[in-house]
């Protein structure tokens, strides 16, 4: 094996099987690209991205870990989100939740 080399099996790898998902349409109203990582709480992404934020509360992008989706200025696209796993508590990001997702949904 060469350092940094990947050995990937053939075929597809199922991720987030059986988890709740939703699909939303996102549009970048900003003048710069916005990139969102795989585990970022989508509800709290850059305000230049316009979409139904309440629908995204408690969800992240349904993409492989360590990857990201880039939204170019003016671009509109549909993305699939997956429910955050675990205790349903979110801290950090933009500081808009800072605790349980079950608490006040405003």
Curated annotation (Swiss-Prot):
Its EC number is 3.5.1.5. Heterotrimer of UreA (gamma), UreB (beta) and UreC (alpha) subunits. Three heterotrimers associate to form the active enzyme. The keyword Transferase does not apply. GO terms for cellular component: urease complex. SUPFAM superfamilies: Urease, beta-subunit (SSF51278). Pathway: Nitrogen metabolism; urea degradation; CO(2) and NH(3) from urea (urease route): step 1/1. This is Urease subunit beta. Belongs to the urease beta subunit family. It catalyses: urea + 2 H2O + H(+) = hydrogencarbonate + 2 NH4(+). Signal peptide: none annotated. GO terms for biological process: urea catabolic process. It is found in: Cytoplasm. The gene is ureB. GO terms for molecular function: urease activity. InterPro entries: Urease_beta-like, Urease_betasu_sf, Urease_subunit. The keyword Cell inner membrane does not apply. Keywords: Cytoplasm, Hydrolase. Gene3D superfamilies: Urease, beta subunit.
